[in-house]
From Swiss-Prot:
Keywords: Cell inner membrane, Cell membrane, Chaperone, Membrane, Transmembrane, Transmembrane helix. GO terms for molecular function: protein-containing complex binding. It comes from Buchnera aphidicola subsp. Acyrthosiphon pisum (strain APS) (Acyrthosiphon pisum symbiotic bacterium). The keyword Cell division does not apply. This is Ancillary SecYEG translocon subunit. It holds the Pfam family TPR_21. The chain crosses the membrane at residues 9-29. Residues 1-8 are cytoplasmic. May mediate protein transfer from the SecYEG translocon to the periplasmic chaperone network via its periplasmic C-terminal region. Residues 30-193 are periplasmic. Belongs to the YfgM family. It is found in: Cell inner membrane. InterPro entries: SecYEG/CpoB_TPR, TPR-like_helical_dom_sf, YfgM.
Amino acid sequence: MLNISKKNIIFFILFFLIISLILFNWKYFSLVNKENLESLKYEKIIKKINKKKSKNLYEVENFIVQNTSIYGTLTALSLAKKYVECNNLDKALLQLNNSLKYTKEENLKNLLKINIAKIQIQKNENNKAMNILETIQNHNWKNIIEHMKGDIFININNKKEAIKSWKKSLFIEDSNASKEIINMKLNELKEQN
């Protein structure tokens, strides 16, 4: 009797291990397939954004609404860029603001906020742009924020604050191309005086 129960115990242990492995593999592969499917949908949607037909944009907007993942946020950024290129700033702002509501990743939020502020500067909504820039607390974005603040101050004709912000940005900036742009702006202001 003891011999039969040992065989039964071994059988049940092996049965349990096999079932566990099957369930684990099934769960793992279903997650991988789901992520691959989202990735493929994202690639397909981005191709539609890059086409010039505007009827594709409705499908893109639906994709963004249905996907509150990183794919939805990245798609919203691409769609907003397309709207800005078509000078449809209100629709671009709408896409970015909607994505900002559900995005959890801090750097993506900051990227959305910077793009929102850029559009608001284009629309001469300088106070709104300044307010949204003030909400970005991460010091890694400080050079971009100060550069944009300088642009805002120029728009409201506050040259002293513009110079101050651009100099802060110049001090923090690592990119030589950005430094050249800031220096050009500073030199242009000096020539005007």
